[in-house]
Swiss-Prot record:
<dbReference type="Pfam" id="PF02403">
    <property type="entry name" value="Seryl_tRNA_N"/>
</dbReference>
<dbReference type="InterPro" id="IPR002314">
    <property type="entry name" value="aa-tRNA-synt_IIb"/>
</dbReference>
<dbReference type="InterPro" id="IPR042103">
    <property type="entry name" value="SerRS_1_N_sf"/>
</dbReference>
<comment type="subunit">
    <text>Homodimer. The tRNA molecule binds across the dimer.</text>
</comment>
<dbReference type="InterPro" id="IPR045864">
    <property type="entry name" value="aa-tRNA-synth_II/BPL/LPL"/>
</dbReference>
<dbReference type="GO" id="GO:0004828">
    <property type="term" value="F:serine-tRNA ligase activity"/>
</dbReference>
<dbReference type="GO" id="GO:0005524">
    <property type="term" value="F:ATP binding"/>
</dbReference>
<comment type="pathway">
    <text>Aminoacyl-tRNA biosynthesis; selenocysteinyl-tRNA(Sec) biosynthesis; L-seryl-tRNA(Sec) from L-serine and tRNA(Sec): step 1/1.</text>
</comment>
<dbReference type="GO" id="GO:0005737">
    <property type="term" value="C:cytoplasm"/>
</dbReference>
<dbReference type="InterPro" id="IPR015866">
    <property type="entry name" value="Ser-tRNA-synth_1_N"/>
</dbReference>
<protein>
    <recommendedName>
        <fullName>Serine--tRNA ligase</fullName>
        <ecNumber>6.1.1.11</ecNumber>
    </recommendedName>
</protein>
<feature type="binding site">
    <location>
        <begin position="237"/>
        <end position="239"/>
    </location>
    <ligand>
        <name>L-serine</name>
    </ligand>
</feature>
<feature type="binding site">
    <location>
        <begin position="268"/>
        <end position="270"/>
    </location>
    <ligand>
        <name>ATP</name>
    </ligand>
</feature>
<dbReference type="InterPro" id="IPR006195">
    <property type="entry name" value="aa-tRNA-synth_II"/>
</dbReference>
<dbReference type="InterPro" id="IPR033729">
    <property type="entry name" value="SerRS_core"/>
</dbReference>
<feature type="binding site">
    <location>
        <position position="391"/>
    </location>
    <ligand>
        <name>L-serine</name>
    </ligand>
</feature>
<comment type="function">
    <text>Catalyzes the attachment of serine to tRNA(Ser). Is also able to aminoacylate tRNA(Sec) with serine, to form the misacylated tRNA L-seryl-tRNA(Sec), which will be further converted into selenocysteinyl-tRNA(Sec).</text>
</comment>
């Protein structure tokens, strides 16, 4: 959520920045709401003061032996007017909050202006895609040859966009997650966390999935019943529970940066993606991911974004997977992001790069929703932290990349050296 002071005092500048990402801010409505809020605020304060004054007069009149009934009626009438004004002010403030919750984050000035992924800016490439002297197979074919990917069984059990993994393919999937966690905890300084896969709606509001993206989630009960605290949603990413660990907290400055990682399944309805990536593991309703989260001081967040992205890149480098780093344009960034890098891994069967990690600096956008703050020795009042997150990496898509980039002419899959300690020294699958 944006700073309310920006919406009150710098509305035109905010609207211009939001326009860069293709969002049209309803400036007129916001101005009208703010003017009405000021009027109601003054009215309620005036009625409260007058009611207090007249209430005190009752005691004085009673001491003088005067008839206090007229004063009581007046106080009651003032109370009714005050209650009505407060109710209207509460309704208006809720309208303002609802509108504020629907407004995306402001893009950083370093983000290129553009409409969609075609306007993203490639920063660099790492590694050279391998040349093959045989017809390249995709991961679905390779997985079936290894008797390790069974999509038909998943359809029987659940439906489309699910998979059953077996044997050495399932083992490699597990090995990848273990390898990523060990790298991030032992070399990059992250604290491993285990978190719930079901979260409440306060948690989803905190990181920005609600109220705007409820249709993308799997809920235990209909979303319309959200007033019931027993309604949960399956997490779309570990970013949601891990970041919310600091919700409502005031951290000591000495505790920052706080770096956490978690390996979880992720659940997404993929609303709006009908017909896209229907074959294989690229776009699933359930997939595993190792998430990286950093909670930092505001002045450190841009450097932290570079560091976090480098940590995700290190996984690809150690697996020797060619990739490219892309800076997303304003029109392609996520709702809560101020700046995002995507890492795209080379997928031979598609002859292109596909997203495998998205690393974002959220500024204080999530922190304001969560009221996540820290106490600085230089400030009397606690300040909002900045939050960052990124995939380190998406495990299923990493499996796709390993299977296709390490495939052999006979259909076997070579196990990357970095993974062999996690697979009892196994060199080939199939």
């Amino acid at each position: 959520m944006l700073d309310p002071n920006l919406l009150r005092n710098e509305l035109d500048a905010v609207a211009e920045k939001l326009a860069r990402r293709g969002y049209k801010l309803d400036v007129d409505t916001l101005r009208q709401q703010e003017e009405r809020r000021k009027v109601l605020q003054v009215e309620t304060e005036s009625l409260q003061a007058e009611r207090n004054s007249r209430s005190k007069s009752i005691g004085a009149a009673k001491a003088r032996g005067e008839d206090i009934e007229p004063l009581r009626r007046e106080v009651n009438e003032l109370g009714e007017k005050l209650d009505a004004a407060k109710a209207e002010l509460d309704r208006l403030q809720q309208e303002i909050r609802d509108l504020a919750l629907s407004i995306p984050n402001l893009p950083d000035d370093s983000v290129p202006v553009g409409r969609d992924e075609n306007d993203n800016q490639e920063i660099c490439r790492w590694g050279e895609p391998r040349s093959y002297n045989f017809d390249v197979r995709d991961h679905v074919t390779l997985g079936e040859m290894a008797e390790g990917l069974d999509f038909a069984a998943a359809v029987k059990l659940t439906g489309a966009r699910f998979v059953v993994m077996k044997g050495q393919i399932a083992r490699m999937h597990r090995a990848l997650a273990q390898f990523m966690l060990d790298l991030h905890t032992e070399q990059h300084g992250y604290l491993e966390t285990y978190v719930p896969y079901l979260v409440n709606h306060d948690t989803l509001y905190g990181t920005g999935q609600l109220p705007k993206f409820g249709a993308d989630l799997f809920h235990t009960r209909p979303l319309e019943e959200e007033a019931d605290s027993s309604i949960y949603a399956l997490i779309p990413t570990a970013e949601v529970p891990v970041t919310n660990l600091v919700r409502g907290e005031i951290l000591e400055e000495s505790a920052l940066p706080l770096k956490m990682t978690a390996h979880t399944p992720c659940f997404r309805s993929e609303a709006g993606s009908y017909g896209r990536d229907t074959r294989g593991l690229i776009r699933m309703h359930q997939f595993d991911k190792v998430e990286l989260v950093q909670i930092v001081r505001p002045e450190d967040s841009m450097a932290a974004l570079e560091e976090l992205t480098a940590h995700a890149e290190k996984v690809l480098q150690l697996l020797n997977l060619p990739y490219r780093k892309v800076l997303l344009c304003t029109g392609d960034m996520g709702f809560g992001s101020s700046k995002t890098y995507d890492l795209e891994v080379w997928v031979p069967a598609q002859n292109t790069y596909r997203e495998i990690s998205s690393c974002s600096n959220m500024w204080d956008f999530q922190a304001r929703r969560m009221q996540a703050r820290y106490r600085s020795k230089d400030d009397k009042k606690p300040r909002l932290v900045h939050t960052l997150n990124g995939s380190g990496l998406a495990v299923g898509r990493t499996l796709v990349a390993v299977m296709e980039n390490y495939q052999q002419a006979d259909g076997r899959i070579q196990v990357p050296e970095a993974l062999r300690p996690y697979m009892n020294g196994l060199e080939y699958i199939g």
